[in-house]
A protein has these predicted regions:
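Solvent-exposed, non-transmembrane regulatory segments of membrane-associated proteins
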Residues: 4, 12-16, 20, 26, ...
Length: 114
């Protein structure tokens, strides 16, 4: 049987237990019926990102025609297991600093009316 390698990337919040993240990701792959047992799934810690710690779940499957469904199933499982283990998937946050204008809108309207 011929296998193809696939990947799912995910970011977790800084401060997360990286060993637990690895364990959860492997569990998610190992428990899907279409993920090959050999070669075994693996996890790479791929990045210290701007908002998250990056991980990559690598796994093999012979079922190329259903792979998007398999990846979706695994992502749902990852989300559920992360919630159970208090592992957060962050999202970028931006701070906006609005500078006030010294001229009020009322003053501008009055000047335009003249």
């Amino acid at each position: 049987m011929q296998y193809t390698r696939f990947r799912i990337t995910v970011g977790v919040a800084y401060g997360s237990d990286t060993k637990l993240v690895k364990e959860v990701l492997l569990d998610c792959a190992n428990n899907h019926e279409y993920v090959a047992k050999r070669p075994k799934p693996s996890v790479r810690f791929i990045d210290f990102g701007e908002s998250s710690l990056g991980f990559e779940l690598l796994f093999y499957s012979a079922n190329m025609f259903r792979i998007e469904r398999v990846k979706s199933d695994i992502r749902f499982y990852i989300d559920a297991k992360f919630r159970q283990n208090n592992i957060h998937i962050p999202f970028p946050q931006r701070d906006l600093h609005i500078k006030s204008n010294s001229v009020s809108i009322k003053d501008d309207v009055t000047k335009d009316s003249d």
